[in-house]
C-alpha cells in the first residue's frame, strides 16, 4: 500500500521489525507455531503458551500478557480456547516465498517512516536494517534491546520513543 497507487493515503509509516527481505530460517521458525491452532483448557494455559512462543517479543508486563490472551483467543464449540486468527495467514510464506524479497517496492516508498528493530531479531537482520536506512525512504532506526522479533513497543520507554518518532514524522 505504501508503495502503490494509494500511497498518498498514508502520511507516516512505523515499521516494526520487518523489512523487504525475510530470512528463510526466521520464516521457518514462525511457520513452526503459526500453522496449526493450539487448544487450551483455560486462560492460564494460554498465557503460558503465549509467553513461551512469543518470548522473542522481549520483556513485557503481566498486564501485557493478560491483555494479549484476552484479545488473541476465542472459545471453540467444544469449550476449549484457541488462538483467534486465520491459520491460512501462512500461505503467503509458503506459496510465494520468492516474493519475500521486495527491495523494488521498498525503493518506491516516499512516505516518511521510521524503523524499529529488536536487537536480537532473526527476521530483520542488522544488514537488512542498514540497507533499508540507506535506501528508499531512508527511515530513522530505533533498536530495542532485550528482544527479538517483534518488539511489543508496550513498555514505558518504548512508548515514549514511539510517541517522539510519531511527533517528528508528522512535522
Predicted features along the sequence, with ranges:
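Active-site loop signature of alpha/beta-hydrolase-fold enzymes
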Residues: 21, 123, 147-150
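Conserved hydrolase catalytic core segment
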Residues: 1-24
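Conserved serine/cysteine hydrolase catalytic core
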Residues: 74-135, 143
Amino acid at each position: 500500500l505504501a508503495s502503490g497507487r494509494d500511497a498518498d493515503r498514508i502520511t507516516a509509516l512505523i515499521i516494526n521489525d520487518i523489512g523487504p527481505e525475510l530470512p528463510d530460517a526466521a520464516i521457518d521458525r514462525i511457520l513452526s507455531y503459526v500453522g496449526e491452532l493450539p487448544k487450551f483448557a483455560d486462560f492460564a494455559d494460554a498465557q503460558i503458551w503465549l509467553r513461551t512462543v512469543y518470548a522473542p517479543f522481549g520483556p513485557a508486563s503481566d498486564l501485557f500478557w493478560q491483555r494479549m490472551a484476552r484479545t488473541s483467543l476465542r472459545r471453540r464449540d467444544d469449550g476449549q480456547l484457541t488462538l483467534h486468527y486465520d491459520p491460512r495467514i501462512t500461505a503467503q510464506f509458503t506459496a510465494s516465498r520468492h516474493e519475500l524479497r521486495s527491495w523494488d517496492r521498498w525503493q518506491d516508498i516516499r512516505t516518511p517512516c521510521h524503523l524499529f528493530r529488536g536487537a536480537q531479531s532473526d527476521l530483520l537482520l542488522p544488514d537488512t536494517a542498514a540497507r533499508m536506512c540507506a535506501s528508499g525512504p531512508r527511515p530513522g532506526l530505533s533498536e530495542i534491546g532485550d528482544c527479538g522479533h517483534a518488539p511489543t513497543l508496550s513498555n514505558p520507554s518504548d512508548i515514549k520513543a514511539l510517541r517522539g518518532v510519531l511527533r517528528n514524522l508528522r512535522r
